[in-house]
C-alpha cells in the first residue's frame, strides 16, 4: 500500500500534519491507535493561554485547523493580560473536549487525499538512510517517502498512580513500545520525560455556591481570522483554594508519591508541577489556586486545574474533600502521572526532519515539548515541509523575528531540552513584533502561497495590510494645530488639549485613545473594519518601540539571510576551535543567525564562518 506521506499519531500534532499534507495535495495516511480518540484533550479542556494563544493564531494564519475548531466548540473565551501591552496578551478558550474530538475526527474523515487506519505502528522502515515506510502490529506495511511521527505520550508510555504502574499512552489506551526500539535502531538518542493530569469530578457533587465564579469575556474574540458571526454559548469557570489541611494530607503521603519514591525517572514540566511537587517546593504558602473548568457544554464533569497528582486514589479523594466546596466530591476519573520517551530535538533540522534519516520528521511531545498548541504548531510545520520536500522545494523555516513558531523550533533544534518545553512570551526577543493580532499579516502570505488559505481570505488580509499602511501614513504625515476647532474636537473626544502643532499619530498614541475616538477623528476611519483599526491603534501606540526592534532586525538581516550549505565542511575552516566545530557539526544550523544562537558559538567564530561561506560561494 503506497502513500506519499504517513503520519503516525492522531493527537494535536498529527491532526495538523495530516491535514496540511492532504490539503497540499499529497496522498496521506494517518495511523492512530484509537480512531475515536483523534484530537483528544488528554489534560486540560482548554486551548491557548499566554504565548500559547500566539501559537494558535499563527497556526491559523498558516492555514492550520486548531483555531477554527476551537471557535466551533469553545465554551468560554477570555483574553488574559488584557490590561497589559498587546505583546503579552493571550487568548484562551475552554473547549468542549468531547465535541472537539468528534469535530476533528469528522473533518479528517471528510478531507480529500487523507485516509485513517486504526493500527499501532511498530517499525519505521528505511533503506540506505532514507525512509521507505511504516510497519504495524497487524503486519501491514505501508510505503511512503515521508513519515511524520507525532506520538505524544504514547512512546513507551508508563502511567503511575501511587505504587501502581500501567503500560499505556493514556488511561485505557495502549502504549507504543516497539516504536521506541525502532527509533533507537535508526540511530536516534532518546530520553525520558514525565507529565501528569488531575482528577475529574462529578459536577453534582461540587458545591458551586461557595466557589468564586469566573465568567468569559462579555465580547469574546475568535481565535481564527476565518471565523465569522462569532457568538459562542459561554459557561463559567470557578476558583477554589487548597488549605493547610490539604497540604498536611499531601505531606503525610509523600512516601506514596511516585515523584518522591524514585518510581518516576522522567523529568516533569517545570511550569506545570503536580500538587505534591508544589507543596514540597513551596512549603511556605498557605494556599494554592485551583481553577474549576467544565469539560463539556453539559458540564457534568469538571477538571481541577492545578491539582495534577499521581498519589494513590484514596489519597486523591481525601485531599480533594479537604478543599472548600468539595467536601462531598466524587472522582469520575483519577489523576495520574505518565512517563514517556522523547527524541532529543537537537537531532532535527529546522524543517523538523531528522538529520540521520532522510524523510523522517518528528513533531509534538516526541520533540520534548508540552502543550496542545506547541504540538499543533510543530505538526503543521512538519506536514508542510514534508509536502514541500516531495515537490523538491525548499522547506518553510520561520525566523525568530517572524513567529513564535520560529522561536519554538529554533530553541528545540539549537538548544535542545532536558525537561518538557513550553512557550512563553519571554522566549521571544522580538515579541512586540510578534503580537497575536498581527499573526495574519506576518504569516498569511505563507499560508496562501502554500495553498492552505484561499484567495478570499488572503484578499481580506491584504486589505488590512493596505488599510494599516495608508492609515499610518495619514496619521504620521498629518499635523494638527491648536486651533479653536481642533481644541474643541479634542475636548469632544475627552482628550487633553495641545499647545503646539503635533502629528495625529502622537494623539492616537495616547493611552486613553480608543478605536471609537479614532473613527470620530477623521472620516477615513469611520467604516474601517475592526481588525484594521486594531492594527492601526497598536502600531501608533508602540511605534517608537516597534521601530527600534525593526532596526535591530535590519542590522542582523544580512546574517539572518546567509545560508550555510548542507554538508558544509566546518573542519576545513582554520581559526575555529574544536568545540565550535563540534557544535556546528552537531546542530547543522541552516543560517548564520541560527549558528549565532547556539550556546558557545562566539561572534568571532560567526565572522570567520561568514568569510568562508562567501569564499565558497565565489569558488562555486
Swiss-Prot record:
SMART domains the record matches: GIDA_assoc_3
Annotated positions binding FAD: 9-14
Flavoprotein is among the record's keywords: yes
Biological processes annotated in GO: tRNA methylation; tRNA wobble uridine modification
Pfam families referenced in this protein's UniProt entry, alphabetically: GIDA, GIDA_C_1st, SAM_GIDA_C
Cofactor(s) it depends on: FAD
One MF term in the entry's GO annotations: flavin adenine dinucleotide binding
Chief place where the protein resides: cytoplasm
Keywords, in A-Z order: Cytoplasm, FAD, Flavoprotein, NAD, tRNA processing
PANTHER family, sorted: GLUCOSE INHIBITED DIVISION PROTEIN A, PROTEIN MTO1 HOMOLOG, MITOCHONDRIAL
Role, per record: NAD-binding protein involved in the addition of a carboxymethylaminomethyl (cmnm) group at the wobble position (U34) of certain tRNAs, forming tRNA-cmnm(5)s(2)U34.
NCBIfam families in UniProt: mnmG_gidA
Descriptive protein name: tRNA uridine 5-carboxymethylaminomethyl modification enzyme MnmG
Gene source species: Campylobacter concisus (strain 13826)
The encoding gene: mnmG
